[in-house]
C-alpha cells in the first residue's frame, strides 16, 4: 500500500451534487479531465482534455473531499460518491487518495469507467489494486464487443477493456456493465449477442 497523499492534485471538469443516474441512490458525481477514447456519441467530449490551461480546475484530494462530504446527509444508506469523466483511471492515483478519505467516513464509492487505461504491468496493476480495494462498485461502459467495431467507434482497441472486466470479476468486485444503444451505431445484433454471452459468463455483474 502506498503512503497516503491527500495533497495530490487532480484536474476537475465538473461536480454534480445531486446525481441520480451515476450509481445507486443519491450521489455526488465528480467528472475528471482526460480520456484516450474518441467515441462518436460521447456525451462529454469537453472532458477529453482542457482546451487551455486556464480551463483546468485543479483540486487536491482533500479539497475535493471537503467539498463533497458536506452532502453526505443526502446520501443516506444507499447513496455515495461516483467519479466519472472523461476517464477516471487516467488520474488513478488521485482517485485512490480521494476514495481513501471517503472510505474513512464509510461512504459508498463508485468508479464509472470505460476501462481503456487498464493494463497488467506490475507497477500499474499494483496501483490499480489499491484503488480497487477502496472501490465498492465499478460501472464499466462497454462501447462495442467486436474489436473492429470498437476501433471504428472509439479509435481504440478493446482488448484491455474486456480484460479489465475479467479481472474485476475474478477478484469478486461488484460491477455493472453498461452499454449505450445508439440505433444504427451500436445496435449490431451479432455484437449484442456476443456482449450478452460475455456478461452471462461474468460473475458479480
Where are these regions (language model features)?
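A structural motif detector for beta-strand N-caps
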Residues: 39, 203-205
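Conserved AdoMet/S-adenosylmethionine-binding subsite of the radical SAM
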Residues: 65, 69-73, 77-80, 85, ...
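N-terminal [4Fe-4S]-dependent radical SAM core
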Residues: 1-58, 70-77
Amino acid at each position: 500500500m502506498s503512503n497516503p497523499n491527500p495533497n495530490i492534485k487532480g484536474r476537475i471538469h465538473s461536480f454534480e451534487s445531486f446525481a441520480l443516474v451515476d450509481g445507486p441512490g443519491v450521489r455526488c458525481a465528480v467528472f475528471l479531465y482526460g480520456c484516450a477514447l474518441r467515441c462518436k456519441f460521447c456525451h462529454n467530449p469537453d472532458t477529453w482534455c482542457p482546451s487551455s490551461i486556464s480551463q483546468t480546475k485543479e483540486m487536491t484530494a482533500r479539497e475535493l473531499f471537503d467539498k463533497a462530504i458536506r452532502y453526505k446527509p443526502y446520501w443516506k444508506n444507499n447513496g455515495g460518491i461516483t467519479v466519472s469523466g472523461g476517464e477516471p483511471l487516467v488520474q488513478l492515483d488521485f482517485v485512490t487518495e480521494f476514495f481513501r478519505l471517503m472510505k474513512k467516513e464509510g461512504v459508498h464509492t463508485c468508479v464509472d469507467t470505460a476501462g481503456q487505461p487498464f493494463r497488467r504491468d506490475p507497477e500499474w496493476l499494483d496501483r490499480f489494486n489499491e484503488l480497487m480495494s477502496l472501490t465498492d462498485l465499478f460501472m464499466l461502459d462497454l462501447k462495442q464487443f467486436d474489436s473492429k467495431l470498437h476501433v471504428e467507434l472509439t479509435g481504440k482497441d478493446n482488448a484491455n477493456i474486456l480484460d479489465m472486466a475479467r479481472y474485476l470479476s475474478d477478484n469478486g468486485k461488484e460491477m455493472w456493465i453498461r452499454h449505450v444503444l445508439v440505433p444504427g451505431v451500436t445496435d449490431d445484433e451479432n455484437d449484442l449477442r456476443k456482449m450478452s454471452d460475455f456478461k452471462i459468463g461474468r460473475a458479480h455483474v
